[in-house]
């Protein structure tokens, strides 16, 4: 059964010690006076050695004897050179003295703050009812457990610069300086946007009853830009919003509204996404939004011949594609991609990474070639392309967008001004487990928390396959829940992946055990995500947990931690995500160790 963790402390592997609470101070070595390389070549200063040493400021004035070689060199100097050298040494000594005094002042101030601790600060912490334990990096909630003494881990006071808000830090970056920050709760109605009757009908059919914050902020802005007179170049758009916040409709609605009255079919909008499953998902959404119009939405696919693909593209208005296939078609049929008015980059943090720079330059160079030589109004006019960039982690690496030739962008940060953003309705839970018992603890978690459906993330394809098989064996021999389980990774065939995904979405599979391949590629409704292995990157954590708590729904993200190293890494992740709630900590007990050992033996026989 579940029992409450006494205190989750990432630096100590989350372990709590039942001893009277007291502060433990980290000993720090005194650093030497800061000097540059030239200072070391001229004068050296003795370091204070303890309570009996001279005052630091006085000691800094005392130069060490200069070597004989230097004295012999001084004999060859002119009077002016000697005087100049002496003055430089005096200046160095003065600067070192000032630095020493400043360090001493800070140390005395810090010691004074420590001495001001009251007896109440040193009292044991007790957990009862719904008390919350405040940590430097977050809050852990425990419910209904016995009173336990706690051990606080002393942490140095953060630098004053660390207290500056993330919003203030972002505003120091030129491209984000004038960003508009929008609260996640700031929702509205689509009636406010002056949309066409056909679009309103489609939104009603899709069940879009309210406009989420990203839609309320961005859709009116985009619609207003379409009223600008050509040939003025329209401002580009940068949006930082969490996964599942409604980004597809945010750019889809204005694009379709702009293109719905077009006369001649041409590729006027291109949407680029990192994975094929995500391409198909977005294609479906845009098709539903464009119903009742003559617009054609096409997804580029590898299973179509080049000749057949060209025939489809000749009548397309909106193309949705992964970068690899898009580059092939642009190079093969450059004239078809010469009229682009909208370039949408979704999941931009991944698409604009180092491996993807080429696709952006291919598309932009093709657009520039199409405009080259158009010098007068009698020649065919080619519109400037407006770039719309969406990402859950845009503010983490804004330099990535430099390759996109961004023009006077409108910038919107939705829901959080932090570098990473996770859904507000997400509940995060951590539990410490031993590596040897992780498969057993996973099954116990599912049973004890009554989790009947979810996604389990692992670090590798091999781990995904082994965990899925262990779950099947333990379910058959121990838990008898009749789970339907599928493993999905880069090692599985595309046919198997598509079939497993469809079965999971249709409810025919209960648990999907997978690698990060799925964290960005599929949009499905799931209430529980389990990080069997903690991700190696902060942004991967964002995309994993973003599979749940989508579009305002509640969801849970469980993370297994093995050892203090992973616990420390989890805390570092927490420093960068837009966390709005405390992290829950829980512990799992099991009485099925014998059955678990038998299940391991069966797995080894199969392997």
Curated annotation (Swiss-Prot):
Position of sequence motif Q motif: 188-216
SUPFAM superfamilies tied to this protein: P-loop containing nucleoside triphosphate hydrolases (SSF52540)
Residues noted as binding ATP in the record, renumbered to the chain: 241-248
Disulfide topology: none
Keyword flag rRNA processing: yes
Reactions catalysed, as given in the entry: ATP + H2O = ADP + phosphate + H(+)
GO MF: ATP binding; ATP hydrolysis activity; RNA binding; RNA helicase activity
Name listed for the protein in its UniProt record: ATP-dependent RNA helicase DBP6
Species, as recorded: Yarrowia lipolytica (strain CLIB 122 / E 150)
């Amino acid at each position: 059964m579940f029992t409450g963790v006494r205190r989750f402390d990432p630096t100590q592997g989350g372990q709590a010690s039942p001893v009277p609470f007291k502060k433990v101070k980290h000993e720090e070595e005194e650093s030497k006076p800061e000097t540059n390389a030239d200072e070391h070549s001229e004068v050296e200063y003795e370091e204070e050695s303890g309570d009996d040493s001279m005052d630091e400021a006085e000691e800094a004035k005392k130069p060490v004897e200069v070597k004989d070689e230097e004295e012999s060199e001084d004999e060859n100097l002119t009077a002016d050179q000697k005087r100049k050298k002496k003055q430089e040494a005096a200046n160095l000594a003065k600067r070192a003295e000032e630095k020493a005094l400043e360090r001493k002042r800070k140390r005395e101030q810090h010691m004074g703050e420590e001495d001001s601790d009251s007896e109440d600060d040193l009292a044991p912490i007790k957990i009862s009812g719904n008390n919350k334990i405040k940590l430097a990096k977050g809050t852990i909630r425990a419910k209904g457990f016995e009173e336990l003494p706690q051990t606080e881990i002393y942490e140095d006071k953060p630098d004053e610069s660390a207290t500056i808000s993330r919003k203030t830090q972002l505003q120091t970056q030129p491209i984000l300086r004038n960003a508009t920050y929008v609260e996640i709760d700031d929702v509205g109605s689509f009636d406010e946007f002056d949309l066409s009757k056909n679009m309103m009908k489609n939104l009603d059919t899709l069940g879009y009853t309210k406009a989420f914050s990203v839609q309320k902020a961005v859709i009116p802005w985009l619609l207003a830009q379409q009223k600008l007179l050509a040939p003025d170049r329209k401002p580009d758009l940068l949006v930082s919003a969490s996964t599942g916040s409604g980004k597809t409709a945010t750019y889809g609605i204005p694009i379709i509204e702009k293109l719905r009255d077009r006369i001649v079919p041409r590729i006027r909008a291109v949407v680029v996404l990192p994975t094929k499953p995500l391409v198909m998902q977005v294609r479906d959404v845009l098709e539903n939004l464009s119903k009742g119009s003559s617009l054609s939405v096409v997804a580029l696919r590898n299973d179509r011949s080049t000749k057949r693909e060209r025939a489809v593209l000749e009548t397309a208005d909106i193309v949705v594609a992964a970068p690899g296939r898009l580059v092939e078609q642009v190079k093969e049929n450059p004239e078809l991609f010469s009229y682009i008015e909208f370039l949408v980059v979704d999941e931009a943090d991944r698409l604009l990474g180092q491996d993807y720079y080429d696709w952006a330059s291919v598309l932009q160079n093709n657009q520039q070639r199409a405009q080259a030589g158009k010098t007068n109004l009698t020649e065919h006019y080619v519109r400037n392309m407006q770039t719309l960039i969406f990402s859950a982690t845009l503010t983490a690496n804004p330099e990535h967008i430099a390759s996109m030739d961004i023009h006077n962008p409108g910038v919107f940060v939705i829901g959080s001004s932090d570098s990473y953003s996770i859904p507000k309705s997400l509940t995060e839970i951590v539990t410490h487990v031993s590596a040897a018992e992780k498969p057993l603890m996973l099954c116990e978690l599912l049973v004890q928390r009554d989790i009947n459906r979810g996604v389990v993330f692992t670090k590798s394809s091999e781990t995904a396959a082994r965990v899925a098989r262990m779950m099947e064996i333990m379910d058959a021999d121990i838990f008898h829940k009749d789970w339907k389980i599928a493993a999905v990774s880069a090692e599985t065939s595309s046919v198997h992946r598509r079939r497993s995904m469809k079965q999971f979405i249709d409810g025919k599979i209960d648990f999907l055990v997978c690698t990060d391949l799925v964290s960005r590629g599929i949009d499905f409704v799931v209430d529980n995500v389990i990080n069997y292995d903690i991700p190696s990157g902060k942004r991967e954590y964002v995309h994993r947990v973003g599979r749940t708590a989508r579009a305002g729904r509640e969801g849970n993200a469980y993370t297994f931690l093995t050892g203090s190293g992973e616990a420390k890494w989890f805390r570092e992740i927490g420093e960068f995500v837009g966390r709005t709630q405390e992290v829950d900590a829980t512990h799992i007990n099991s009485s099925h160790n014998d059955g678990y050992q038998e299940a391991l033996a069966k797995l080894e026989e199969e392997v």
